[in-house]
Every structure is written in structure tokens, then in C-alpha cells.
Amino acid sequence: MKTTIIGCGYLGFALAEKLQKKHHFLTCTTVNPKSIEKLKKTTQKSLIMRGTDKNELSLILENNDTIIVTVEAKNSDEFENTYLQTAHTIKECAKEIETPKRIIFTSKTSVYGNLEGMWADESTPLKAKDDFAKILIDTENTIFSLNDLGWSVAILRLTQVYGGENHEIIDLFKKSYKEVMPGHKDYYTNMVHRDDVVGIISYIIDHDIKGIYNISDDEHPTREEFSKKICEKLNLKMPKYDPTLADFSDNNKRVANYRIKEKGYQFKHPRRII
């Protein structure tokens, strides 16, 4: 199978390693020149390219069966260009391609907005109010509209991904730890191990699954409960939480994962590894 991964970074590279072992012919793109040599060891073709480069993207889409979009914005200034404009470029190219493709897009559960602690499943209305989440919603809609061109579309709404490459929970906590942390202490946390995101994408390809799916593990401790476990392990002072310090849209929800389980996927890490 000919497969391309557009935006091969933290998640995309792990996915490339998985698919390479399953004998996919891989074309992977990155915007980071430092990643090229690493990608060359895993892929048949790798190139530096932005998702808005229509000429390059058109060739890639034409020559591959499965397109996986795992782009990630480096900063807020690049958010719209990285997500929405990439989606628009893909759709422009798709209109010129005769053979329908399969596309898998990794979105985020921030599209649900603040649900005040309620559960979010795939039927939950998208009520996000911050600009970044609105861009993701528009991006999802653009990708989903490829169904009209006969494409097979899967959208994965990821919670916070951890695992591997200095992204273990302990590593992430150490980087953000302060005696006073931003946010509400009683808000729920939602995470998923990178192994499961990679496993789910591979499973979706193998079983020709389409639609929208939340990707989260089974645990939803509050920030306070979660921090307590980590602080006990690291022998750190338990932080306090101050909502007024948050420079982000502080959303409270529990993300349900039953729909992907109903498709037969079994989580490798249903509980968090601390």
C-alpha cells in the first residue's frame, strides 16, 4: 500500500515506523530540515514541504492510496496556515484527482469547548469559542467534505498525547511544574498514549474504517488527583491551582472513547503510565 504522512513530527514519525514494519510504501513530509535524515531511515521518500504547497501536494496525493494528516503548529501564529490552509489545499488538489483516496486527519478534542465536566462523545455539539478551536472545526469540516468527492474520511479527535521521546507523563509534568499552576484544580484531565494513537490509525487502515472518533484512554482524574500521584512519585510539593493565571481556554470535560472500542480496537494503555 502506498501511504503518505503529511506533517511527520512527534506523532507522524512513530506512525511511520509502525507502517514501515507493515510494509507500507511511505512518503513523508516535514517542515523541519533537521528531521529529514531521520525520516530517510524509515521512509521510501521524504521531503521538506508545507501542506499549502499545491504543486508538491498534488503529486503526493495522486501517487498514494492513503493520506494521513498529522500536522502540528509550532506556535499560535502558524495555526491557521498549518491546519485550515492545508485542508483547503488538499481539497483543491482532490478536485483534480480522478481516483478517490482514503484520508485520516488528527484533530483535537478542544473542538468541544467547555462542557462543565460533562461527557463528550462524537455526537456532542461543537461549542468551542476560542479562535484556535474554531480553526480546527473549520478544518474538520473541510476534510469531512471530501466525502462528497468519494473519498473515505476518518477524523480522529485526540486528547493530550504522551509517551516516548521526552513526552512521558513525568517529563511533561516536570517541564510545566510550578508551586502555583494555571487552571482549575477540579477540572478533568484527558490523555492518550502515543502507542494507541499509532495503533488506532493502523487499525483504521487495516479495517477500512471511516467517520469521527474520540481518541482518549479510560482515565479522567482531576488535575488535583493527577498531580498528587505524580508529586508523590517525584517527592515534589503539591502545587496549588489558580484559574486567573491561565493564558489558555480552560475547558472541563470527560472524553468518551467507546465508539472506537465498538469498532473492535483494544487499547494498549487504557490506564495512564506514570
Language model feature labels by segment:
Residues 64-104:
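NAD(P)-cofactor binding segment of oxidoreductase domains
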Residues 49-54, 247-274:
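C-terminal amphipathic/interface module of NAD(P)-dependent oxidoreductases
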Residues 12-13:
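N-terminal Rossmann-fold NAD(P) dinucleotide-binding loop
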Residues 144-188:
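NAD(P)-dependent short-chain dehydrogenase/reductase
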Residues 170-180, 186-213:
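Alpha-helical substrate-binding/gating segment
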Residues 198-200, 206-251:
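Mid/C-terminal beta-alpha module of Rossmann-like enzyme folds, strongest
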Residues 116-155:
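Catalytic helix-loop patch of NAD(P)-dependent Rossmann-fold dehydrogenases
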Residues 89-131:
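Conserved Rossmann-fold NAD(P)-dependent oxidoreductase catalytic core, especially the SDR/UDP-sugar
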